[in-house]
Amino acid sequence: MNIKLNEEKGFTLLESLLVLSLASILLVAVFTTLPPAYDNTAVRQAASQLKNDIMLTQQTAISRQQRTKILFHKKEYQLVIGDTVIERPYATGLSIELLTLKDRLEFNEKGHPNAGGKIRVKGHAVYDITVYLGSGRVNVERK
């Protein structure tokens, strides 16, 4: 019965700890870069929400055969549909800048806007939302 312990191959405690510490350092490095990605997602979602709200206001004007409007303020925008007012506050760190659009966007009974123009949603990324006069078409573009 000869037992040879020295021929067993494996990792030492020092080698295992070294690999685990390198893996944890890499994970920390990866997860510290995620907040900017989250912030970019927040800006994209805010631009998408604003586009959807513009289209909702337009479609409601057509379906109810009444004028609807969106009012833009410094910290929020409001959808005014008949007697109903829906307030949408801007997320923290985001701002909405009216480039060529006035502080009020109205849709008539046929869904046509009273004015066309651009709105800029700014945060870690920048999105321009264009409302076209006449057709009322809404386009979102990342800058």
Curated annotation (Swiss-Prot):
Pfam families from the UniProt entry: N_methyl
Positions of the propeptide segment: 1-10
Annotated GO CC locations: cell surface; plasma membrane; type II protein secretion system complex
Keywords in alphabetical order: Cell membrane, Competence, Membrane, Methylation, Transmembrane, Transmembrane helix, Transport
Residues passing through the membrane, by range: 11-31
Top-level taxon in the UniProt lineage: Bacteria
Record's comment on post-translational modification: Processing of ComGD in competent cells requires ComC.
Membrane topology, record value: Single-pass membrane protein
Upper classification of the organism: Bacteria, Bacillati, Bacillota, Bacilli, Bacillales
Entry keyword Hydrolase: no
Disulfide bond positions: none
Assembly notes: The transformation pili are flexible filaments, consisting mainly of the major pilin ComGC and smaller amounts of the minor pilins, including at least ComGD, ComGF and ComGG. Interacts with ComGF. Interacts with ComGG.
PROSITE patterns: PROKAR_NTER_METHYL (PS00409)
Key word Nucleotidyltransferase present: no
Compartments where located: Cell membrane; Cell surface
Function in brief: Required for formation of the type IV-like pilus (T4P) that plays a role in transformation. Transformation pili are dynamically extended and retracted, perhaps thereby promoting DNA uptake and transformation. Required for transformation and DNA binding.
BP terms from Gene Ontology: establishment of competence for transformation; protein secretion by the type II secretion system
Official protein name in the record: Competence protein ComGD
PTM-bearing positions, type N-methylphenylalanine: F11
InterPro entries on file: ComGD, N_methyl_site, Pilin-like, T2SS_protein-GspH
